[in-house]
Structure formats: C-alpha cells, structure tokens
C-alpha cells in the first residue's frame, strides 16, 4: 500500500518505539501469553488536531481499509488474544504484525512442540474472531494516561516489568536476592514506572497540525 507522507507519519520497525517493542524481552510475555500484537505498519494523521489516540490508524494490506487504531483495545476486549495477528473485521484476513525478538527465539526453540497443530489452532482462532468485533465502539474509548491515569499506568508497567525480570534473571544465572537486583527493581518501579507513564501521557496528548 502507498500512503501520503504529507498526511501520515508511517510507523514501522525503524521507529524507536516500535524497535523497543521488538527488543524488550519483557514484552514476550504480552505476546506469548496475552496475545498482544502490534501491526507491521501503522499510521498517524499529521493533519488532524485530535489527540494521538484518535488519529492513529492500522491499514489492512488485503482490503486496503484504514482501521481506527482503537479497534484493538482493552475496552472492546480486542487488545489481547491476537496470537496470529490482528483480525480485519472488514475482509476477515489477518493484518501482519511484528514479533518480539525473545518471542521469536522461544518459538523457534519450541517449534517441535507447537508446530504440529499451528494450522488447526489458527483456523479455530479465525472462526472465533468475527463475534469479537460485532459490537466494538471506538469513539467511547478514553486515553488511559489522561489526568492522573499516567501514574496508575506507570506503576503498573513498572511492577509488571519487575515481575517478569524476577522470572527471567534466574534463567540467566542472576541472583534475584542480591542488593544490586533489589535496588534495580525498586528503582524500576518507583522511578522508571512514573517516568514511563509521564512520557506516554505527553505522547498520547500530542495533537497534529492542520498545517502539516
């Protein structure tokens, strides 16, 4: 698909935020267990004065429709369980998604276990998707970082990331009871979490410009 670069900012793996999603090992949990995915290509309307959340779009390469980015959200119950990609409610195809590097490594190593039933699992997954998108509402979705929401979201991110590191560290031989690890995890929760939340608040409250 071709996009008007004067109208849209195009997000691919080359964008630093998307690259963070690919390289952050903690996000493998989101993909493998929760089924949270992000598309290979997403768009931001630079000409709209609306907040970022309301001017982000996901293009379907199959039917070429631009979906409102809020189509896949926790409020609609569609943010998770997208293990095989993002389902397009318009044409019924699957919008290609990026994959976290750690997720890729885990899937490669465990392929002999799940490879046998991948095709049948995907078919069952596809059959369940139309019902999930029958009554979605995008206009009612609010920015979770709005007001003081960034504090809650920030601490939530810090706590979840710390828990994932507590699982990951022993695997690579790091003592989770060492002073250095404890200080690191507390800093991640008390400093990194709120900082992450505030940065996301600023990002989601950005508006475009009609002059763009």
Predicted regions and their residues:
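Membrane-interface, cytosolic juxtamembrane amphipathic helix immediately N-terminal to a transmembrane helix
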Residues: 91-101
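Cys/His-rich microdomains that often coordinate metals
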Residues: 66-69, 94-95
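Juxtamembrane/disordered regions of integral membrane proteins
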Residues: 137-212
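Short, intrinsically disordered terminal segments enriched in charged and Pro/Gly residues
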Residues: 1-50, 101-148, 204-205, 209-210
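Short, flexible, mixed-charge glycine/proline-rich loop motifs
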Residues: 47-57, 77-83
């Amino acid at each position: 698909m071709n996009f008007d670069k004067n109208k849209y900012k195009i997000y691919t793996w080359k964008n630093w935020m998307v690259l963070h999603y690919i390289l952050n090992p903690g996000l493998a949990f989101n993909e493998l267990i929760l089924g949270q995915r992000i598309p290979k290509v997403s768009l931001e309307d630079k000409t709209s004065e609306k907040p970022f959340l309301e001017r982000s779009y996901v293009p379907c390469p199959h039917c070429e429709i631009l979906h409102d980015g809020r189509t896949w959200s926790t409020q609609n119950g569609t943010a998770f369980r997208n293990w095989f990609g993002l389902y397009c409610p318009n044409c019924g195809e699957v919008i290609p998604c990026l994959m976290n590097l750690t997720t890729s490594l885990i899937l490669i190593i465990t392929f002999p276990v799940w490879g046998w039933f991948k095709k049948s699992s995907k078919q069952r997954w596809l059959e369940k998707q139309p019902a999930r998108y029958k009554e979605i509402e995008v206009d009612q979705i609010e920015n979770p970082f709005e007001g003081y929401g960034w504090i809650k979201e920030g601490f939530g991110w810090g706590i979840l990331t710390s828990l994932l590191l507590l699982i990951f560290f022993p695997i690579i031989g790091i003592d989770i009871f060492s002073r250095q690890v404890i200080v690191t995890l507390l800093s991640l929760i008390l400093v990194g979490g709120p900082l992450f939340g505030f940065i996301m608040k600023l990002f989601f409250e950005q508006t475009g410009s009609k002059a763009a």
